A protein has these predicted regions:
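Outer-membrane beta-barrel "beta-signal"
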Residues: 155-167
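Gram-negative (and chloroplast) outer-membrane scaffold detector with strong preference
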Residues: 32-107, 132, 136, 165-167
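Acidic, glycine-rich flexible loop segments
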Residues: 119-126, 130, 140
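Outer-membrane beta-barrel domain signature
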Residues: 47-48, 53-54, 97-98, 102-104, ...
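Transmembrane beta-barrel architecture of outer-membrane proteins
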Residues: 13-15, 26-28, 65-69, 119-123, ...
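Cleavable N-terminal export/targeting peptides
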Residues: 1-11
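Transmembrane beta-strand segments that form the barrel wall of outer-membrane beta-barrel proteins
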Residues: 10-24, 29, 41-52, 138-148
Length: 167
């Protein structure tokens, strides 16, 4: 007889998840849908993250990255019953970078770049899932997005914590 707990990450099993993102200064959120494969899982979703950057004046430039993404994470190690799993992988993303979304900079501030820009890039990630009950897992991980088109910062980092629910 097959133990049901080992089937939680079987190929074809779908899930939804929600994560909080943090880079030790700013915050964001991510939501995704995915499906397990024999060696890991693929996912698609949307993410938004607030950032800020110092300027030559006393003000900080706030900006937001909003994007959709697609990824594949490969299972690196797991427990026998797959109640704890570690994944590594990456993905691609595209969306928008919005500068000063709350219009907090003085009106006479010249940025030298547009207020919105197309954003695209790739990212690498490491993720661990800890099943607390049969169909619910706590997720913890780290992401390093490389933005090819950002006018502010090319390389970012995020740590994430969230919940994953099996469908």
């Amino acid at each position: 007889m097959v133990n049901a707990s080992a089937q939680r990450t079987m190929a074809g099993q779908g899930y939804i998840s929600a994560d909080c993102l943090y880079d030790f200064e700013n915050f964001g959120a991510k939501a995704e849908y995915g499906q397990y494969t024999l060696g890991g899982f693929w996912s698609v979703g949307a993410s938004g993250h607030f950032y800020d950057a110092p300027t030559s004046s006393k003000y900080n430039l706030e900006y937001v990255h909003c994007y959709v993404f697609g990824a594949y994470m490969h299972r690196l190690v797991c427990t026998r019953r797959r109640s704890v799993n570690l994944y590594g992988g990456g993905g691609v993303f595209m969306g928008a970078e919005v500068l000063d979304p709350m219009s907090r900079l003085p009106k006479d501030t010249v940025l030298g770049i547009g207020r919105t820009a197309f954003l695209y890039g790739v990212y690498a990630g490491l993720s661990a899932e800890f099943f607390i009950v049969e169909k619910v897992a706590v997720m913890a991980g780290a992401l390093v997005p490389l933005n090819f088109s950002s006018g502010i910062r090319m390389l970012n980092y995020d740590v994430c914590l969230g919940l994953k629910v099996m469908l």
